[in-house]
């Protein structure tokens, strides 16, 4: 019984020490938590910025740079102190070069952090539109089989020429190598080459795919297969229509390719690729297999540059075979009011819906094109080809 007080005293001392240890350890636990990252949120990496995204100043474009950083850190953007509001920061920066790297640096008790993004300045931007027609093969087969005296005896090309004469419209026709009934491009004669050449200022031909089927032919295919098919079609275009008529591809069938194919495409002259960048139940689709962040950004913006390949990606604004005639203007009008969509109109449709024998033939398809081109023309948009300059604009 004599050692009982001692044991009680030791117990109390031990308990106090343990409790003290917990209290003393608390600050260490807090300090070990990861600090908030420093990140530039606007502009987005790869953003294509034009006059609508900032203020035009002498030889430059003044933009806002926004982001987040640890609360007490000092933040600089390209060497200039940023204004802090809570964990946010904002700074102004003048773009003076075609490409600019933006560097945000934060320094504080947790050390130094930085985040970098690169943006592209569309210095000579102007309102412009590109008209692309996918899945072309029927008109080539029609001309080859009927042996017309002129290319424009084919109603399809005649319609496009009338739109050109009326509005100065330009078109790029994305073509297949073969049709399902066995027609192939080598069967198309070269006797129309002079007409193709004379029309090459407003009418171009480009590779789309080897054939319409199977669907998504390049989504899982190696780059070598895509490039081989591209080369076959390009060779034939140059043979029967001349190099003046050839355009590097701007839309790959289904808008899905392996990331490893982008650099080889760029080496074949591809400067721009268009897609839908649309959200579906399984994720993002017709997006060239971009990651979620870039796909989401492109769903809300005109364009984004992939610096690794050098290709600029464009979001298709409207698909006319899916848009009723009375919905064309209501679809275009809000785009023209949105600074992220207003500068460049990427207009799009598919050839097969013009042909009466096609199961889903659209009788007013030509009227839809006329309504759209009339609207963009009346609102000051100029026709361009995306493979020329920066999305058809001067560089």
Predicted regions and their residues:
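N-terminal export signals
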Residues: 10-30
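C-terminal domain-boundary segment and adjacent tail
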Residues: 272-277, 347-395
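Active-site beta->alpha N-cap acidic-glycine motif
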Residues: 116-197, 347
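C-terminal segment of N-terminal export signals and the immediately downstream linker at the start
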Residues: 26-43
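Secretory targeting signals
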Residues: 1-6, 19
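Active-site-adjacent pocket scaffolds in enzyme catalytic domains
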Residues: 181-185, 244-245, 254-347
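Surface-exposed, short loops/turns at beta-strand junctions within beta-sandwich domains
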Residues: 93-99
């Amino acid at each position: 019984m004599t050692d009982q007080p001692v044991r009680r005293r030791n117990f109390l001392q031990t308990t106090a020490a343990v409790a003290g240890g917990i209290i003393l350890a608390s600050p260490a636990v807090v300090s070990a938590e990861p600090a908030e990252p420093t990140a530039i949120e606007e502009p987005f990496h790869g953003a294509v910025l034009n006059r609508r995204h900032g203020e035009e100043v002498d030889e430059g474009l003044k933009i806002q740079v926004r982001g987040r950083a640890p609360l007490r850190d000092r933040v600089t953007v390209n060497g200039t102190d940023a204004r802090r509001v809570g964990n946010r920061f904002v700074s102004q920066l003048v773009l003076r070069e075609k490409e600019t790297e933006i560097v945000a640096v934060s320094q504080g008790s947790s050390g130094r952090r930085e985040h970098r993004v690169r943006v592209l300045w569309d210095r000579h931007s102007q309102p412009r539109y590109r008209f692309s027609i996918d899945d072309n093969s029927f008109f080539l087969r029609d001309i080859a089989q009927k042996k017309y005296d002129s290319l424009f005896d084919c109603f399809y090309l005649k319609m496009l020429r009338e739109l050109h004469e009326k509005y100065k419209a330009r078109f790029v026709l994305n073509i297949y190598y073969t049709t399902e009934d066995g027609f192939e491009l080598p069967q198309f004669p070269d006797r129309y080459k002079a007409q193709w050449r004379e029309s090459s200022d407003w009418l171009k031909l480009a590779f789309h795919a080897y054939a319409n089927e199977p669907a998504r032919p390049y989504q899982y295919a190696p780059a070598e297969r895509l490039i081989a098919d591209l080369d076959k079609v390009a060779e034939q275009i140059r043979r029967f229509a001349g190099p003046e008529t050839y355009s590097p591809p701007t839309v790959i069938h289904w808008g899905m390719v392996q990331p490893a194919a982008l650099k080889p495409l760029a080496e074949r002259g591809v400067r721009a690729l268009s897609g839908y960048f649309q959200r579906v139940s399984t994720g993002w689709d017709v997006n060239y297999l971009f990651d979620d962040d870039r796909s989401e950004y492109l769903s809300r913006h005109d364009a984004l540059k992939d610096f690794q390949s050098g290709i600029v990606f464009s979001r298709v604004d409207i698909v006319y075979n899916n848009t009723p005639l009375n919905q064309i203007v209501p679809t275009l009008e809000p785009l023209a009011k949105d600074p992220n969509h207003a500068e460049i109109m990427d207009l799009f449709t598919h050839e097969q819906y013009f042909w009466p024998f096609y199961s889903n033939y659209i009788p007013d398809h030509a009227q839809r094109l006329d309504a759209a081109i009339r609207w963009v023309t009346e609102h000051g948009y100029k026709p361009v080809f995306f493979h020329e300059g920066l999305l058809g604009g001067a560089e």
